From Swiss-Prot:
Belongs to the complex I subunit 1 family. It is a multi-pass membrane protein. This is NADH-quinone oxidoreductase subunit H. NDH-1 is composed of 14 different subunits. Subunits NuoA, H, J, K, L, M, N constitute the membrane sector of the complex. It comes from Ralstonia pickettii (strain 12J). It catalyses: a quinone + NADH + 5 H(+)(in) = a quinol + NAD(+) + 4 H(+)(out). It is found in: Cell inner membrane. Its EC number is 7.1.1.-.
Length: 354
């Protein structure tokens, strides 16, 4: 099918076809992503309601299914008020600087074999680079707002993101060591080889099992990176109201909100790709092989997003010093230690990744 589309596009658009095809694939990711964010918020409210033994949204549409549409319309109709004391240029560009990296990172995430916007060999390096850019938008928002609450939230966010990116980086290096490739498709394919995969039990050959500490560190660090509960001291309502977003309203505020939920989906998709076999089914059986790989990736992402929500419903917010201690004194030594263990494992006779 892809070959037919490529042939038709080349004949129709000529030399412009590569650019047109890239734009089409980008739109095919961005539009469903926006819909996913809307209904992820509904799922979050429904699941937390169920955990709290209440109904959650149930008034707009059947079973509250139109609640996200109502929320979007509400934000679109709200006036974007720019306070007089802000630095206007930085104030306006900050939400875009937070949102753009969250969307750009989807360019290299494989939905199934050869199904991605850009299949670059340095995909893992691209992920590490792009994921670090969002913090600049947060710092700009805090500085430009000319508010002590916004500035304090921005400083917390920058320190927290930098602290946990180190542990996440070490986890990614470990994945690179055992797979020998920076290409995300190669990383998925490498997880579906070996003894257990040869016997049809793919789930036991995925990276989560031999790299279990890295799997836990990467996902928990991802929760901290996205400033989600219990690491949401950046916008701690009882301390600094909304943190770096306090002076934003309407669609400007919605862009920050959108970026947060897109980043949740990004972390879940990357965790599924790097540690949970990506688009592969857990069991190599005829009854499961007919299901498209894209569907398996969606299931894994959905389950990981539900863990995000469960953490919010179950745990109290940590103090800021506890969050810093977890990142610097526990996660970084743990990842460095396991990095050494994996390095020794790779050169030993018991190397399971040969």
């Amino acid at each position: 099918m892809i070959e037919s589309i490529t042939s038709f596009g080349t004949a129709t658009f000529g030399g412009w076809w590569p650019l047109v095809w890239t734009l089409v694939r980008a739109v095919c990711i961005i539009l469903p992503l926006l819909l996913c964010v809307a209904y992820l918020i509904l799922w979050e409210r429904k699941l937390i309601g169920w955990m709290h033994v209440r109904l959650g949204p149930n008034r707009v549409g059947p079973m509250g299914l139109l609640q996200p549409i109502a929320d979007v319309l509400k934000l679109l109709l709200k006036e974007v008020m720019v306070p007089s004391a802000v630095s206007r240029g930085m104030y306006i560009i900050a939400p875009l600087m937070v949102l753009m990296p969250a969307v750009a990172i989807w360019a290299v995430i494989p939905f199934q074999a050869e199904a991605m916007v850009s299949n670059i060999n340095a995909g893992l390096l691209y992920v590490m680079a792009i994921s670090s850019v969002g913090v600049y938008g947060v710092i700009l928002a805090g500085w430009a707002s000319n508010s002590k609450y916004a500035f304090l939230g921005a400083m917390r966010a920058s320190a927290q993101m930098i602290s946990y990116e180190i542990a996440m980086g070490f986890a990614l290096v470990t994945v690179l060591m055992v797979t020998g490739s920076l290409n995300l498709s190669d990383i998925v394919n490498s997880q579906n080889r070996g003894f257990f995969a040869g016997h049809g039990i793919n789930i036991l050959s995925w990276n989560w099992l031999p790299l279990l500490p890295m799997f836990g560190v990467y996902f928990i660090s991802g929760v901290a990176e996205t400033n989600r509960h219990p690491f949401d001291v950046v916008e701690g309502e009882s301390e600094i109201v909304a943190g770096h977003m306090i002076e934003y309203s309407g669609m400007a505020f919605a862009l920050f909100f959108l970026a947060e939920y897109i980043n949740m989906i990004v972390i879940s998709a990357l965790t599924a790709t790097l540690f949970l076999g990506g688009w592969a089914s857990p069991i190599d059986a005829p009854v499961l092989n007919w299901i498209p790989g894209f569907f398996w990736l969606l299931i894994k992402v959905f389950l990981l997003l539900s863990v995000f929500i469960w953490l919010r419903a179950s745990f109290p917010r940590y103090r800021y010093d506890q969050i810093m201690r977890l990142g610097w004194k526990i996660f970084i030594p743990l990842t460095v230690g396991w990095l050494v263990v994996v390095a020794i494992w790779l050169v030993s006779p018991w190397n399971i990744w040969k």
